[in-house]
Amino acid sequence: MNKVANSYAMDPVVDVPEYQLQQFQSLILKLFQCCQERMQYQCDRFQLPDAELRCLMLFGEERYLTAKGIALKMNVVKSRVSKIVDGLIKKKLIQRIKDPEDSRVSLLSLTPVGSEKLNEINEFLKDVHYQVLCQITPEQRKAVLTNLDILKASMEAVKEMMV
């Protein structure tokens, strides 16, 4: 049995049976591989490298972004963002505009072509997620979504402990 410190439980040490730990590791690995394969398919389908595709998707949440903001959201250095942004500009998916409040700052925004591409990507993702949910009975969906929320919260809590 593995003893795992748990700062959220009443008992400071939680017993995690080895079989559960192994099953969890195996499932996480398989989910990660499945997501990686979908990302590769998506990159091929939309003819964008992974980093450019992930960057483009950030514009779904924001009308304007800065290179610094992209670097923070993508967890990469600003010089890497410059290369990604240059690729998206070359493909006419985003454009640079001067910040009206600070001419030293360049804002990045989607072009009409970029907006259309992002809509295609989002429609593709919506369809993929719909197809996944269709594989799960309506009764099980609620439990799956609840458990995914719990998993996400647990993973974020552990991530915070690592920082």
Residue ranges and their predicted role:
Residues 2-8, 87-149:
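Charged, amphipathic alpha-helical coiled-coil/dimerization segments
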Residues 21-43, 118-136, 141-155, 159:
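Hydrophobic alpha-helical core bundles mediating ligand binding, dimerization, or RNAP-core interactions
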